[in-house]
């Protein structure tokens, strides 16, 4: 249930989440963040104010491996799955107003372990598993999803950054180090991650993004500038 804050060069430990969990979605900023869902099909939602996490309104449907986008007062969560095996995926989309969730239009392709970025009225969903990995992209307008340009390769457990018309995806179980940029219509290849990873954290813009932690690069952090993918390599603290 630990949280850490990034200042552009180093990490410092923040106050803990009230409920520890993995495979949740997160969105917002360092001083106004949201974390929702996670393992054990949690509906739990917590908000961060830069110091403390507080519980907020529960997701309508508990799930893990979902994606999120937007701000603390105007967010959106989509996709995900819950057992049994094989996994039962969700196309569900829910919008967050800062205190409660309401259901919106479903994804066209049911998927989990997908990437997401953007805003509540202009979100982007890409990749994921159905359970086979897919390369499809969908664009959200605040009420419904429509097809966007396909990624150049199938991928799942990838992360995203940026906006619907200037997006980025990187890492993942299928492509490892690959980074792609999206212009609102199509994807193009960008400089690769130095270390391949999946099921990790990612955030930022299409010209200033962070990839942090998880499998197999547990404490490794990379910073993307749009020209050179890694300008610093930092280590997440474990204390």
Question: What is each stretch, according to the model?
Answer:
Residues 1-239:
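Polar, enzyme-active/binding microenvironments
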């Amino acid at each position: 249930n630990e949280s850490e804050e990034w200042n552009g060069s180093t990490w410092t430990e923040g106050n803990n989440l009230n409920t520890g969990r993995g495979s949740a979605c997160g969105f917002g900023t360092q001083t106004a963040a949201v974390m929702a869902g996670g393992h054990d099909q949690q509906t739990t939602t917590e908000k961060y104010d830069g110091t403390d996490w507080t519980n907020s309104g529960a997701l309508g449907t508990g799930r893990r491996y979902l994606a999120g986008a937007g701000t603390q007062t105007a967010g959106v969560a989509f996709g995900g799955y819950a057992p049994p095996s094989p996994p039962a995926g969700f196309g569900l989309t829910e919008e967050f107003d800062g205190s409660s969730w309401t259901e919106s239009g479903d994804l066209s392709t049911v998927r989990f372990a997908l990437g997401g970025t953007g805003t509540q009225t202009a979100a982007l969903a890409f990749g994921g598993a159905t359970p086979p990995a897919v390369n499809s992209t969908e664009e959200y307008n605040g009420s419904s999803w429509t097809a966007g340009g396909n990624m150049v390769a199938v991928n799942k457990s990838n992360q995203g950054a940026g906006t619907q018309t200037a997006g980025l995806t990187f890492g993942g179980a299928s492509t490892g180090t690959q980074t792609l940029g999206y212009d609102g219509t199509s994807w193009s290849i960008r400089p690769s991650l130095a270390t391949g990873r999946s099921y990790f954290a990612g955030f930022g813009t299409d010209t200033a993004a962070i990839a942090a932690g998880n499998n197999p690069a547990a404490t490794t952090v990379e910073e993307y500038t749009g020209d050179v993918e890694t300008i610093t390599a930092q280590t997440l603290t474990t204390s």
